[in-house]
Amino acid sequence: MKKPVNVAMVGLGFGAEFIPIYQAHPDAKVHAICRRNEAELNKAGDTFGIDQRYTEYEQVLADPEVDFVHINSPIPDHGKMTLQALDAGKHVMCTVPMSTSIEECEQIVDKVKTTGLKYMMAETVVYSREFLFVKEMYDKGEMGKIQYLSASHPQDMDGWPEYWEHMIPMHYATHVVSPVLGLTNSKAEYVSCFGSGTVREDIQKKSGNKFAVETCHIKLLDSDLSAHIWRFLYDTARQYRESIDVYGSKKSFEWTLTEDGKHVVHTAKKPEPEIPELVEVPDYAHLLPEPIRKFTQSIEDADHLSFVQGGGHGGSHPHMVNEMVSALVEDRDPWPNAVTSANWTCVGICAHQSALKGGEIVRLPEFTLK
């Protein structure tokens, strides 16, 4: 593909954090921005010096200069907006999850296959410095044989936009699914999930879900490994956390219990008091083009008053931008591609189905295993 690659940013709440990263990337250009609220749209356009501004998504898709759309819309719109973009001949990067229905996930996978367009689910966890640290240890053989993986994402969503009250915990599970599958580049074959506890009645009515917590075991395809994940959204006391614990034959990694703590690496065959070591996880900005390395850390931008850029989600944002832009320039699939994104997303959908059936095993759809 030609350089620079023209991106249209769709959704400018969380999405606005990506604009300066694209603007600094040597192979990308923010061609257009889209937001329904015209006042907020113009504010963002003026702040970042972007002239092409749209209040309607259909206007973005009709613009022949747009190469790909970066979708940051509310979760219920992800599948529909992705399919619209693919139908319009646009490549897509979309924030998580891919969809909340297996049917839409399959439609996206099929459409990517038939059109040859690129799709990437913008999963932050697998580009966070913590995941990259564990992945580096694993790839170097320092962890030995992986024996078990576990991940958690407790988060109290009271006070967030109202549509969250309609969500089911495992329908927003890619932050825990992706690291336990992504570390060994595996896919999930089947799941068994239990619901636990109950949320208050108004949440039950809106979401159709009674479970406060959903806890799931995942069997990895063509592997002797299983992984354990759990989620909650309401009515359970716990500080926000997106964690991954990885247990190997030589070394293991455990996530800190609290936000201000340090992660722990355990090394086998040492005297018992010496097995655990508190570690400082390094930054991985060196993997990025120099102009966007600064965005792995939080920075105050003097040109954009009070706007804090970079550093979000473990420094993952510039890595995701670089992956999508590089995939388009190099004409290769981004990671995660459509099939992998569907597998990660459908784990959560299948997990909730399992919970409704008392933990019955539910197999992942065949289209996610290819």
What are these regions (language model features)?
Residues M1-F48:
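N-terminal Rossmann-like dinucleotide-binding module
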Residues Q52-A62:
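Short acidic low-complexity segments
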Residues F68-I75, G79-V126, G141:
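Beta-strand-loop-alpha-helix segment that lines the small-molecule cofactor/substrate pocket
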Residues G89, G116, G141, D224, ...:
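Glycine-centered short loops/turns at secondary-structure junctions
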Residues D158-R241, D245, V339:
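Rossmann-like dinucleotide-binding domain that binds NAD(P)(H)
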